[in-house]
Structures are given as structure tokens and as C-alpha cells.
Amino acid sequence: MIEAEEQQPCKTDFYSELPKVELHAHLNGSISSHTMKKLIAQKPDLKIHDQMTVIDKGKKRTLEECFQMFQTIHQLTSSPEDILMVTKDVIKEFADDGVKYLELRSTPRRENATGMTKKTYVESILEGIKQSKQENLDIDVRYLIAVDRRGGPLVAKETVKLAEEFFLSTEGTVLGLDLSGDPTVGQAKDFLEPLLEAKKAGLKLALHLSEIPNQKKETQILLDLLPDRIGHGTFLNSGEGGSLDLVDFVRQHRIPLELCLTSNVKSQTVPSYDQHHFGFWYSIAHPSVICTDDKGVFATHLSQEYQLAAETFNLTQSQVWDLSYESINYIFASDSTRSELRKKWNHLKPRVLHI
């Protein structure tokens, strides 16, 4: 019994010292309250206060309300300068939390009022990544260009074209494409053509799917693309719109899942932490990665997500370490990056695990 207790992760510093990989982080949803205050101060005429952009401890919102929050945040990040500042701050915060490899995702946006184009939007993020690298932060950052379902298939095609251009010109910084946005808007079949085009061009696909119940057909259409990773997959294994067929398909193809506990509980797609689908996928040893989704909006950080998973599902420190180490397998960067990260983890292991 005592041994088991010793194995239980008890100190918060274990989680922050743990080297981590973050694979599901939306840029505009990851803005901390510190950065948000700076943005709000620059735009007093908008009359936005920081309580409009965060869901504090113990609070919940509907999924619809969460998407409305993003609209509010977009009003604050309307210029290339805003995007650059936000990118640098978000990267620094992830690095401070022990994240060694980060894939940020964001939808290119045009803002006529400031003259920001979709291209300058992407370039601002890339500049933020570049400047962070020059500051010698201990974090490797990549960018997935996101397709927002609300934009429809024509905008999706434009976004894919942009992603292809940057995929070719950035030497591995732009690695893939994300399909996200309000899951109640649009239909999967409308996005098949642009997504297939992206895949053909060599871009990796991370697709949000099965975020809401009763979407079996929609989910199967997206799964048939054989995405490289699945975002959320909340209802794949549920009686409401999930099915054994879907679970078997995901298992058979070993498609990794990006799982975000606080996000799902606070947006009420999952009733409680102990009912989170991480428990199901982890119990069958399926590739699963703990992620934050929107660390700003949901007032969390990756260390906290690991701690929540460990405490909810009774994971030992060794199991938590393995969960983090195995997440390296599912990054979109090259094999050489994977082996660099594994070296880093192995170097840190004796210090973090206190073996």
C-alpha cells in the first residue's frame, strides 16, 4: 500500500518539470489573462473586459457560448502586430510550463479595418515562432493552418492553397492542416475535396470530429480520409452517435486522439472528469495525447491537464511519464525531430522521476 502511495504523483512540481508535447492548441484560445489585459488596454473602445474571454474555475459554458467567446477574442487580435505579440506570449507561456514541442493551430483571417490579409496573418505567426527561437526558448514550435467550418468549402480551398505555399516555403514549420470551428455548421462532405488536396500535397491532417452527439455519418466521412490525428473524438465510443464500428475503425488504423479534459468539461460536452473518454481510450492502450485546446479560455495549462488525468484515473508517475514520452510518436514533425525529443526526455528522466 505504501509503495502505491509513493508511486502516486503528489507534487504539482512533478507535472511542471515533466517534459511535455502540446499537439492541440488554438492560438486565439490560448491567450493568457496577462496578454488579454494588454490587448484590452490597446482597444478600450471595444468595451471588452477580461471576464468575457475566460471561463474561470468551477464555471461552465455551452459549446455555442464558447464559440461566441472566440468571436470576442478575434476583435482583440485584429492586426499583424497583435498576432505577433500573442504568438510570442503564448509560446513563452507553454515553454515556462515545460512544453518542449508545440504545434499551434490557427485560421488565417482577413481584417479590412487594419489591412491584415490572410497571408500577413500567417507571416505574423511565423515571425513570432522565429523570434521565440532567436530568444533561445527551450521549445520547438510548428504551425498547423486551420480551416474553419464556418467559412465553407470555397474558403477552405483558399486556406489549403495558402497552407501548401507555406508548407513548401517554411522548411517544416508549417506541417499540416486542422479542420475545426463550430461542429454544428456545415457538412463534412463539403470539405472532402480541399482536405484530400491538402493530403495529396503532403500536409498532415488533424481533424476535429465527433465533438457533438449523433454525427455518425459525418464522422465516418472524415475518418475515411484517414486523418493523421483526431481532435476530441468525444462521442466516438458513446451510445449517442458513436458506435463500435467507429471505435473499431479508429483502433484498427491506430489514429491518435488529442484529448482535452478541462475543455470538454467546461464546454459541457463531457459531464465530469471521471466520465471523460480519456479513461476509455487509455484503458485499451490506444494512442492518446493530453492537450489543452484553449488554455486561455479554459483557464488551464498542460501541467494541470496531466495532473487532472493522473488524479482522475489514478495514474502513477511512471504512467504519466510514459504518456508524455509516447506523445512524441504522434507529432507531425520529422523522425529526426522525434529522436531529438526522445533524447531530451531520456536526459531529463532521472531528474524528473527521481529514480
Curated annotation (Swiss-Prot):
Return the GO cellular component terms, semicolon-separated: cytosol
Q: Name one GO molecular function term.
A: adenosine deaminase activity
**What are the entry keywords?**
Hydrolase, Metal-binding, Nucleotide metabolism, Zinc
The positions annotated for binding Zn(2+) are H24, H26, H208, D293
Sorted alphabetically, which Pfam families does this protein's record hold? A_deaminase
Question: Which class of enzymes does this protein belong to?
Answer: hydrolase
Catalytic center residues? E211
Which InterPro entries would you find in this protein's record?
A: A_deaminase_dom, Ado/ade_deaminase, Metal_Hydrolase
Cofactor field: Zn(2+)
Listed under catalytic activity are: N(6)-methyl-AMP + H2O + H(+) = IMP + methylamine
Report the EC number(s), separated by commas if there are several. Answer: 3.5.4.-
Q: Which GO terms describe its biological process?
A: adenosine catabolic process; inosine biosynthetic process; nucleotide metabolic process; response to alcohol
The UniProt site entry described as Important for catalytic activity is assigned to H232
Answer whether the UniProt record assigns the keyword Metal-binding to this protein.
yes
What does the entry comment about cofactor binding? Binds 1 zinc ion per subunit.
- Asked whether the UniProt record includes Zinc among its keywords, one would answer yes
Binding residue positions for N(6)-methyl-AMP: H26, N28, H74, S106, T107, P108, R109, D148, G181, E211, D293, D294
Q: Which family does it belong to?
A: Belongs to the metallo-dependent hydrolases superfamily. Adenosine and AMP deaminases family.
Subunit annotation: Monomer.
As for what it does, the entry says:
Catalyzes the hydrolysis of the free cytosolic methylated adenosine nucleotide N(6)-methyl-AMP (N6-mAMP) to produce inositol monophosphate (IMP) and methylamine. Is required for the catabolism of cytosolic N6-mAMP, which is derived from the degradation of mRNA containing N6-methylated adenine (m6A). Catalyzes the removal of different alkyl groups not only from N6-substituted purine or 2-aminopurine nucleoside monophosphates but also from O6-substituted compounds in vitro.
Protein's name in the database: N6-Methyl-AMP deaminase
Record the organism.
Answer: Homo sapiens (Human)
Could you tell me the gene encoding this protein?
Answer: MAPDA
